[in-house]
Structure formats: structure tokens, C-alpha cells
Amino acid sequence: QASGVIIADTGQELLIMTERKVISGAKSIHVTFLDNSTVEAELKNYDGNTGIAILNVKRSDIEESTLGRIKVAVLGNSLQTTQGSVVLALGSPLGTNFSILTGNITSTSNSISTFDANYNVLTTDIVGSSQGSGVLVNLSGEVVGIVMQDYSSGDENTLTAISVSQLKDIIEKLSNGQDIPY
């Protein structure tokens, strides 16, 4: 179980970004929206290096009342996020769905290394869970970081997130069904 964020509405389907880890090996994938309606989703593509997965949900499978409440997230510029910036952790930062926590960015200078790249990490003072997932949102409502279980900090009590600005190209390619070359 993890959270996801709606990153695009193509008119035919909604694209939802989540962690591959939590759907890997699943026989079926179901998405639950804030109004507790649940629909089936399909894996569109994933990046094995970062662990990001893109799901698609057919708009025709979603009730009109639910569609009317859905908003597509704006992926912001996390490079403008500085130490002391106020952020909201949305999704399941405590490991339970529909959680919201607030706090500040404590560092923007840390990074993680994957097979082919280094990614900036946003460290916060938000007490969360090592099983947490979701996004960090700035006060303008833009996603600036992606909280992922595989990249939790050494201090398991505080949330860290990968800087979304460095992931935009990967997210776009996955959303278009393209594979990520290594």
C-alpha cells in the first residue's frame, strides 16, 4: 500500500505516479481516490533505477462525482526550494493513506546515487514513517519532492524526498510509455 499522485489527464485516462515497489508482483492494481471510490489501474511503465511507476486509470471507469473532485498535480521547481521552506507531506507519509503533515526543509544539499545518476534529496523535519510515501508540496501547491520508501533517510523518523525537478524527464518518458535507457 502506498500513495500516488495524479500527474496527467489525457482526456481518456488519468496517469498516476507511484512506487513500483508496492505494485511489483501484484495480480491486479486498484486505486482508491479521496472519496473512497476504487477503480482498477494498469501499469503503464516504470523505471527500475528510481523505482517510479506510472499507472493509468480509464476515465470511463471513474464516477462523474469523483472526476469532478480530481485535480492534476503541478510538478514544481524543487531547485527553488531552500532550507527553511515550508512544505506539506501529502499521501501516506505516516504509512497510512490520506495523511497530511507539515514541516520545513532542513537541507537541500544531500544526494543519493543510483546506477546512472545522482539525485538531490530534500530533507525535512517532518516526523514520518520509513513505510511512508507521497509527495512534498510547497505553499503554492506544487509538488517539489517525491517521498519514497527506498530512499528514506538514515534517520527513519524524518521524511526525505527526491527533488522532483531532476525526475521530470523520467516522469514524462514513462508517462508516454517510453523506456528509460541506461
Predicted regions and their residues:
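Catalytic-histidine neighborhood of serine endopeptidases
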Residues: 9-52, 57-60
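Active-site substrate-binding loop(s) of clan PA
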Residues: 6, 31-32, 42-44, 62-96, ...
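Flexible, gly/ser-rich surface segments that form the specificity/activation loops bordering the active-site cleft
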Residues: 73-117, 151-159
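C-terminal cap/linker of serine protease catalytic domains
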Residues: 41, 139, 143-182
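Catalytic nucleophile loop of clan PA
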Residues: 5, 128-147
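Gly/Ser-enriched beta-turn/beta-hairpin loop segments
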Residues: 46-50, 58-67, 108-122, 173-181
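A conserved glycine-rich beta-strand in the N-terminal activation segment of trypsin-fold
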Residues: 1-13, 37-40, 74, 100, ...
